Swiss-Prot record:
The chain crosses the membrane at residues 9-29, 93-113, 266-286, 304-324. GO terms for biological process: protein insertion into membrane; protein transport. This is Membrane protein insertase YidC. It comes from Parasynechococcus marenigrum (strain WH8102). Its main location: membrane. The keyword Kinase does not apply. One of its GO terms (molecular function) is membrane insertase activity.
């Protein structure tokens, strides 16, 4: 499903924007905005639901406890009263459905930006090498990888599959050649004959596991050396993987630290992601009663995620998408938190805000201890 959405929805939109402005960086920005605008009603529903639940949750929990205590011996009446509470305030799970609906599209967008033309496309083949006397009893089962759209020109791409006709089980001393071809069986080498400078799309071959078990040549021929497990990986270079955008040196560049150098463009993108995530969380609590636990989580979460992405191998193009998406999310959150609440929730919110301000006001009016709640009793 992810691949279908990517090939039939997202890549055509990407082609359209690249045709308007020949910049893959701008195409990523435009694609991100279009998808986020299209998903606005769904994400807005989730934000509204989360905002309302944050206000109503203390009241819901209090009423649920009272109902369970009052009707402890009458489960039918208990369920009936609990249902009334859910009907009045809504289900806490109501905000999850819009998120689930939009997840396939967001995953497809993420997968699109991790593939061609923005990054090198890997094909992974897991092999099992058996002794010669055992391989004869194995029935060959053809292997076909997942299809990936490979851009061979700015707006021209073909679906490419890696296959082994006799499967991934080899006998010691056997050889097999990995075929790269389109869905209709046309060889990838044949496709490249119509491309300028076809050598830039030449796949690179490597052994990521079991380099003592198999050997692989530059044409994709695998030779089994000894019994064991091995993994061979082919990578087809991405057309735009080395293209830059603004301060980004290469959209396909991966990693904050590589080859002994710091990639400052990646560092800036990761920092921008953390900052926009923090801003979005800060805006989600705007106009709400103070919640120390939530405030702490809002500070720690962006730092943890930002630190993780510094060392998580994401291409610069994906990080650019994440920053733009976070900016859109922050703007959307700001607009939605300014919406009027239902009357019953507004009353609850007013009471919560009053309860927080009354103790401080009363203490100050009485001329007593004017310390703030978090200050030690020993004085300032």
């Amino acid at each position: 499903m992810i691949g279908y959405i990517s090939d039939n929805l997202l890549i055509p939109i990407l082609d359209f924007f690249y045709g308007l402005v020949p910049s893959y960086g701008l195409a990523i920005v435009a694609l991100t905005i279009v998808i986020r605008v299209a998903l606005y009603p769904l994400s807005a529903g989730s934000i509204r639901s989360a905002r309302r639940m944050r206000i109503a949750q203390p009241v819901i929990q209090k009423r649920q406890a009272e109902i369970k205590s009052r009707y402890a011996n009458n489960l039918q009446k208990q369920q009936e009263e609990l249902g009334k509470v859910m009907k009045e305030f809504g289900s806490p799970l109501a905000g999850c459905l819009p998120l689930l609906v939009q997840m396939p599209i967001l995953f497809a967008l993420f997968a699109t930006l991790r593939g061609s033309p923005f990054a090198d496309v890997p094909y992974t083949i897991n092999l099992k090498v058996l002794p010669a006397d055992q391989i004869a009893a194995v029935e060959p089962k053809p292997f076909n990888s997942a299809s990936h759209s490979i851009f061979i020109a700015e707006t021209d791409h073909v679906p490419v599959i890696a296959s082994l006709p006799r499967g991934t089980k080899l006998g010691v001393g056997d050889s097999a050649t990995v075929n790269l071809h389109t869905k209709d069986g046309r060889g990838f080498d044949d496709v490249l004959t119509a491309v300028d400078n076809p050598s830039r799309f030449a796949p690179t071959w490597s052994i990521t596991k079991g380099d003592d078990v198999v050997n692989v040549s530059d044409d994709g021929t695998i030779t089994a050396l000894t019994a064991g497990d091995a993994t061979v990986e082919a990578k087809i270079p991405g057309l735009a993987a080395r293209s830059g955008f603004l301060f980004i040196k290469a959209l396909g560049q991966v990693g904050f630290y590589a080859d002994g150098d710091i990639n400052w463009d990646i560092a800036i993108l990761v920092g921008g992601f953390g900052l926009t995530l923090f801003l979005s969380q800060l805006l989600s609590g705007m106009g709400m009663p103070a919640n120390p636990q939530q405030a702490t989580a809002n500070k720690i979460t962006p730092v943890m995620i930002t630190g993780m992405f510094l060392f998580f191998p994401l291409p610069a193009g994906v990080l650019l998408y994440m920053v733009i998406a976070n900016i859109f999310q922050a703007l959307q959150t700001f607009l939605l938190t300014r919406e009027a609440l239902p009357e019953n929730l507004q009353k609850i919110l007013d009471q919560q805000m009053t309860q927080q301000t009354v103790p401080v006001t009363a203490t100050s009016a009485g001329g007593g201890d004017a310390r703030l709640p978090f200050e030690p009793k020993g004085g300032k």
